[in-house]
Amino acid sequence: KKVCGQDFPVSLRYSVESKTKGFREGALPGESFTEAGRDMAESEKAAKYLQDAGYDMLNCDNGTYDAWYWAHPPIYMPENCNLEDVAHIRKFVDIPVVCAGRMDPAAAIADGRIDGAGFARQFLADQEWVTKLMNDKEDDIRPCILCHNGCFNMCHYKGVPNDQALSDSLHLARCAVNAETMQWEKHKIVPT
């Protein structure tokens, strides 16, 4: 804010709870465990502190490196797995709170439980999905199947990982359902 001015919006990706049982031990939905990282009581105080420090929005999820699947829920995680925690945190701040991670946000936004929803993987699957929603073409949307095979480089063929090099930072993301994602220079039709 000192550099860009007070009217420049600053948001923070904020994990409400760590969902971590211990070093390299993430918790699963519905599991009874003792939180080793940030718990809800700490998060309630931290969210208010972040607002007072000047953040204009909290873009929330759950998880840590040891429980990464909360921030990027795969198909086996329940839909709206972060919603209750994020909606709870909204009560402690006066700035917009966005919820990320595999969700259907319409009812939660309409009810005022959250202010918005964060999406990333769906844009890899279909970069035009918002336009298609706005134009009543929902049936034309190529959906993210939550597989992590392309976007997280987790697919292997005969023991060989996909062709994404760690140094490929300009075309880092891939998508299992959209071969063109971040590969426009590689996969294209060249007029002859």
Q: How would you name each of these model-derived features?
A:
Residues K1-T192:
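Flavin-dependent oxidoreductase catalytic cores
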